[in-house]
Every structure is written in C-alpha cells, then in structure tokens.
C-alpha cells in the first residue's frame, strides 16, 4: 500500500512532467525555421480552431514529444505516452504519423513517400492522412500565430488527470 500511495502521488504529477517535456522541444533539432514546440503549438492551435475534440488537440500537441529521446522511433514513443489516455484510433494515428508524414518529404531524400500505403487497409488510414495534412506538415510556418503553451495547460492538466483506458489488454 505504501508504494502504491507513492506511485499514485507520482502519477498525479504526470501533467507537469509532460508540460516540461513539451517546453524542452523549444530547444530541440535545429535547422527548422521554428522549434518543435512551436510546431506542436501550431498544429494544436489549428485543430482547436477547426473544432477538433480535446483528444486530437492533445495528440497533436504531443505527437513529436519523442523527438529528443527517440529520434528513430519518436512516433512510437509519443503513442506509448498517450495510449492510456486516448482511443485506439488516436493511438494508431500517432504511432504511425511518422510514416504518413513521409509523404511530404521522403522523395527529396531518397525515401518512399508512399510508404503509408502499407496501411491502406486500416480503418484509420484516412484519419492519419488528415492528421498529417491539416495539423503536421503545414505547421512549420514562422509567420503563423499559434496559441501559447499556457493556453493549452488547463487542457493538458484535465486530460492527463487519470487514464481513460487502463485495461491490461489496451496497454500491451
């Protein structure tokens, strides 16, 4: 019981740790006109103004959270963080967004821009295309005025207050 209590206390701080991780994206991966944090804020702002639900807004905010620690598998890392809090659909989209995003740039560096077609039979294929088209590939604009992180903090705190999906089979 003692360790469970300590773990519960630790888990209550998850939103703060996630916000700190988002802030760290402000100084990651040079070469772009904007930071990864600004990129994430642009996507979340666009989703907010488009009327997307909170789950998608949060998924967009955190879709690149793995860039610093898992540059070769950032999509999977972001999806793993979100998994207890999002639907299977959103989990799948975030997990595969890196492959879907390749459509916009892979052909410039010898990659396969159509790699996403491996997933054409997924029920969420078109949703992943929309995610990348509307809230990822177009969110590197140095002139776009995104909402600040502070705008999203109450949403983050609420969303990550407790897992929505904690059945063991959902976490395997």
Indicate where each model-derived feature is located.
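Metal-dependent phosphohydrolase cores
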Residues: 1-61, 65-172
